[in-house]
Each structure stands twice: as structure tokens, then as C-alpha cells.
């Protein structure tokens, strides 16, 4: 029997508890989960791809079936390269669904053998985004309940609040 492989893509700039929840839930369902840290040329990231990968590796180290990699090409090509049969995306709101449906439709057009699975975020993460975390952290406010400890520290260092 072949392994069930999935890809969880995102910029993860930075990784939040919402992202981590989706990754953990995907890891419960699939044999191997590739977390694809995307290098999106349309975004101006706070953290480099290498920094985001290191933070992701730290926060997922207790998940033995999760692999952290980066990708800068088409997601569907990355999924095919990894022999994934699924792309897993987290949804917070209806607005997320509309955007994700466009991406899913294009991915299906490019390769109809790879399915997209949407996982609804837990209620406590429904408002959470990396952009909101960065905005709050930039002004020195507490983000301990939004991101893992290593991310809190990395944000403090980026914004000059470290001891």
C-alpha cells in the first residue's frame, strides 16, 4: 500500500498557532506531510525563506512525519515532484474560501489527480494571520498566545525588542 502524501503550502511569515494546528491535523491524516515554505515574489517577507524554514522545523520537530522544504515554483509542480495526492489548506473565513477556490481550480486544471483538502481553523485561530501577528509585534505588544515561543523571540529580534 502506497503512502498517503500531502503538501501544506504557505509563506509562514511567521508561522502561527493557526498554521501549526492545520499542520498537526494534516499529520494525523496523512503518512507524510511536506510543509512547503513558499518564496512568493509578490510578497515582501519579514523573515527569509531560511529563517522561516528554521522556525517551522523547530515548531514541528515533535511531528515525525512532517518534512520542511522550500519552493518557489508552481505549487502543483512541487506536489507532483513529492508524489503528493493532496494539497491541504486552512480556511478561516468565507473570504479565504473564495480565494482558495480560484487556486484550487487552477491546480485541478493543471493536474486533476491531486486533490485539495480544506481544513477549517479552530475558532480560537479564526482571526489569526501572519500579517496581524507582525503588526502587533512591531509595536512591542504581546504575541505569546498567537505564535510559538521561538517565533516570539525571532519577532522581538527582528523588531529590536530582544533583551
Curated annotation (Swiss-Prot):
Biological pathway: Cofactor biosynthesis; coenzyme A biosynthesis; CoA from (R)-pantothenate: step 4/5
Cofactor field: Mg(2+)
GO molecular function terms listed in the Swiss-Prot or TrEMBL record: ATP binding; pantetheine-phosphate adenylyltransferase activity
Primary subcellular site in the record, as a coarse category: cytoplasm
Site residues (Transition state stabilizer), renumbered to this chain: 19
Record SUPFAM superfamilies: Nucleotidylyl transferase
UniProt keywords, alphabetically: ATP-binding, Coenzyme A biosynthesis, Cytoplasm, Magnesium, Nucleotide-binding, Nucleotidyltransferase, Transferase
Binding site for ATP: 11-12, 19, 90-92, 100, 125-131
Entry's EC annotation: 2.7.7.3
EC class name: transferase
Cellular component terms (Gene Ontology): cytoplasm
Chain residues that bind substrate: 11, 43, 75, 89
Cellular localization per UniProt: Cytoplasm
Main function: Reversibly transfers an adenylyl group from ATP to 4'-phosphopantetheine, yielding dephospho-CoA (dPCoA) and pyrophosphate.
Subunit composition and interactions: Homohexamer.
PANTHER family referenced in this protein's UniProt entry, alphabetically: PHOSPHOPANTETHEINE ADENYLYLTRANSFERASE
Protein name per its UniProtKB record: Phosphopantetheine adenylyltransferase
Organism name: Lysinibacillus sphaericus (strain C3-41)
Gene behind the chain: coaD
Amino acid at each position: 500500500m502506497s503512502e498517503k502524501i500531502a503538501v501544506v503550502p504557505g509563506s509562514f511569515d511567521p508561522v502561527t498557532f493557526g498554521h501549526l494546528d492545520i499542520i498537526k491535523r494534516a499529520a494525523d491524516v496523512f503518512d507524510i506531510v511536506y510543509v512547503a515554505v513558499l518564496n512568493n515574489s509578490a510578497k515582501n517577507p519579514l523573515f527569509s525563506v531560511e529563517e522561516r524554514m528554521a522556525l517551522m522545523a523547530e515548531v514541528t520537530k515533535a511531528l515525525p512525519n512532517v518534512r520542511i522544504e522550500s519552493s518557489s515554483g508552481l505549487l502543483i509542480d512541487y506536489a507532483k515532484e513529492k508524489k503528493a495526492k493532496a494539497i491541504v489548506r486552512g480556511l478561516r473565513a468565507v473570504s479565504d474560501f473564495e480565494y482558495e477556490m480560484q487556486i484550487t481550480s487552477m491546480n485541478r486544471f493543471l493536474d486533476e489527480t491531486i486533490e485539495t483538502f480544506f481544513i477549517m481553523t479552530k475558532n480560537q485561530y479564526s482571526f489569526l494571520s501572519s500579517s496581524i501577528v507582525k503588526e502587533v509585534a512591531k509595536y512591542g505588544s504581546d504575541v505569546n498566545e498567537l505564535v510559538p515561543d521561538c517565533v516570539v523571540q525571532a519577532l522581538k529580534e527582528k523588531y529590536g525588542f530582544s533583551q
